């Protein structure tokens, strides 16, 4: 009866939800993310510099939905602490007050979070490398746009309730 956060184990749940929409014919895996989230059109790749003054170059191609699902989109997480892009993610992630430095959840709604992440350069061109990242958060935003529902409502209606996962939800006030 213990309630706890499942953190990154939400990634397969989000991926299943997105693939349900794929099965409905709402997108193709090769579709550019920018087709549904305009903020991701014409991505730029980091060359040099530091936040907020980056030198960039155009990415070799657009980010595909497949890239998001396979963590090959060029995105990152702030907690890697490897690059200047990680540092920029920490700035975006911590919010205006800097009060979310444990990376436990995006401080913004998914629409604004997606726009903030898209405003930053990619670490590499889509498809070039694998990097554990916020790609699943962007998949969550895609689910919202494609389904017309918030992510938590979609997961509840199409995953948790059909599987009788009555104690599973998006956020718990009990933690």
Predicted segments, located by residue:
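P-loop NTPase catalytic cores that bind/hydrolyze ATP
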Residues: 134
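Short, intrinsically disordered, charge-balanced linker/junction segments flanking boundaries
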Residues: 1, 174-175
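Active-site-proximal loop and beta-strand segments within enzyme catalytic domains
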Residues: 1-131
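Hydrophobic "lid/gating" helix adjacent to the active-site nucleophile
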Residues: 163
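Short glycine/serine- and small hydrophobic-enriched flexible loop segments
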Residues: 19-24, 137-145
